[in-house]
Amino acid sequence: MKSAGCGKMRTLQDGAGTVLSGGKSRKYTLRVPDDYDNNHPYRLILSFHGATGDSSQVAPSYFGLWSLSEGSTIFIAPDAVGGFWSADDDVTFVDDILEQVTDDLCIDTSRIALEGFSQGGAMAWTLACARPNVYRAAVVHSGGGLARPASCQPVAFMSSLGQQESGGAGQTSNSDFFAGQNGCTVESLAKAPRGGHACSDYEGCSAGHPTRWCDYDGGHTPSPNDAGQNMSWMPQEVWAFLSQF
């Protein structure tokens, strides 16, 4: 579905942006394809940094998805106040970003997705639960720090956690939670081999709500490498998941 910004001359430019939210000027970083066409509705991915961080930890690579998207996607990295996300104020903040951006840029409002790391991952699942009719999918890397709302509804969901993290070693509570919401069969999933990774799809999920889990032998990071490899395997896994929508 085309947003109100389709057909308009854009005023928002790449780089730092601001929006008034809750009476405060809030910041985010925007990246639009170089050959942007104001009549073409783009996928939008919102990328959330971890605790104590800011959008510079995410932009300009957006967890490695920018290069993989090949001009198909607009990316936004919001900034948390003081580096920490709030389940209340920041849901409204992201609402306000979306209102501003969809009014100015040509967005496919049926293909808005979330990705976040650590507390930013928790912010992604909070938004997926709070606004299930807005977000098509959510990807959570090592998410923690915010409570899951009780009002969660089905949403396509992917998560990952390292075996060497606190609460790791096969801890699938995030993915199991959303698997339950999505009507999937909660089952024993593949474990990563030493120095490697293993990704698994839950079975029996409701139509349009695939649920995927990635286990890896590593620590607290959104971009783990397999042993002996210089490049992370995670961006390709995430892009394969999100680009199906």
Task: Describe each PLM feature range.
Residues 158-161:
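Short beta-strand/loop motif that positions the catalytic acidic residue
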Residues 5-7, 15-113, 126, 130, ...:
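Serine-hydrolase catalytic machinery in alpha/beta-hydrolase-like enzymes
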Residues 82, 193-199, 213, 217-222:
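Histidine-bearing beta->alpha loop at or near hydrolase active sites
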Residues 164-168, 220-222:
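Acidic catalytic loop of the alpha/beta-hydrolase fold
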Residues 75-77, 210-215:
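Conserved beta-strand scaffold positions in the cores of enzyme catalytic domains, especially
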Residues 1-44, 88-89, 115-139, 143-145, ...:
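A domain-start/cap signature at the N-terminus of enzymes
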Residues 56-67, 96-97, 141-150, 193-203:
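Alpha-helical scaffolding within the catalytic cores
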